Amino acid sequence: MTKSIVFSGVQPSGELTIGNYLGALRNWVTLQDDYDCLFCIVDLHAITVRQDPIALRKSTLDVLALYLACGIDPNKSTIFIQSQVPEHSQLAWVLNCYTYFGEMGRMTQFKDKSARYEENVNVGLFTYPVLMAADILLYQANQVPVGDDQKQHLEITRDIANRFNTLYGKKDAEGKLIESVFTVPECFIAKACARVMSLLEPTKKMSKSDDNRNNVIGLLEDPKAVAKKIKRAMTDSDEPPVIKYDQKNKAGVSNLLDILAAITGKSMVELEAEFEGKMYGHLKTEVADQVMAMLTGLQERYQRFRQDEALLEKIYRDGAEKARMRAKKTLDEVYKLIGFVG
């Protein structure tokens, strides 16, 4: 039986956070046995914001080592660096020509980022979703694990795929589509996917690009420094303190409970019972202890991989070769259909 194809990726810009791990990377590991997985380090996307070249190269290898430390296995999944598969850029240009200006203008992430990086509102930032569409459609991905901030981009990917299929897909005598050019991807919903919020502003998602580093727990941060951040995390002023899950009225407490549940596997009912009558300090101490233990093990594995650059190079070169074999098949078909000389 053919496995369903899953594609996902992370930008090598900024240090990955426990939100990236608990919300994405850890779930990717569980997919490897049942799905045909491609996990990319999307460095082409990273340069929509100015990057220091030396830092970008280092960060790209850091992310690769973190993938491996988290349990992503190159013998089970295709792991590669986006810029080493030129078909991504080639297909993106073609798809740009089948995407409308107004569609890109409605993308909320472009509006947010252009406001934040107003000194560098470049065309790459504007057409970012088209490159993301190329990333996905190139491999005929069936499912894509995405966060809430990327769901709109997946929808435009589906629109582009359907538009191209309508124009170039094989049709029967009545004009009904019988064979598509691109697989139209679905959003992959993980059974257990933690959404980790900012420590000091728990109504917004934890982001690796947050300028206030006290909001963020980096995967490579010193565990003791992380513990101090957690102990300063926002809760509330209820008196007496009440530790219960209520995202609307107790966002800070709920965020700490979410982190604890994701690491320990305990249910909210179990955690609420465990902390009944206790102070917020007790909750913060337990969260800090669990996060420190998780990070210590992860960082030990990371260091082993990161120090072996020969291994990292072999993995990303082998991964790029495997990815290119698949990507070329799709791109060749697209070029043929639109009339390019082969």
Curated annotation (Swiss-Prot):
One of its GO terms (cellular component) is cytosol. Coiled coil: none annotated. L-tryptophan binds at D135. The keyword Nucleotide-binding applies. GO terms for biological process: tryptophanyl-tRNA aminoacylation. Its EC number is 6.1.1.2. A motif ('HIGH' region) lies at residues 12-20. It catalyses: tRNA(Trp) + L-tryptophan + ATP = L-tryptophyl-tRNA(Trp) + AMP + diphosphate + H(+). Keywords: Aminoacyl-tRNA synthetase, ATP-binding, Cytoplasm, Ligase, Nucleotide-binding, Protein biosynthesis. It is an enzyme of class 6 (ligase). One of its GO terms (molecular function) is ATP binding. ATP binds at Q11, P12, S13, G19, N20, G147, D148, D149, V196, K205, M206, S207, K208, S209. A motif ('KMSKS' region) lies at residues 205-209. Its main location: cytoplasm. It is found in: Cytoplasm. Pfam families: tRNA-synt_1b. Catalyzes the attachment of tryptophan to tRNA(Trp). HAMAP family: Trp_tRNA_synth_B. Homodimer. Belongs to the class-I aminoacyl-tRNA synthetase family. This is Tryptophan--tRNA ligase.
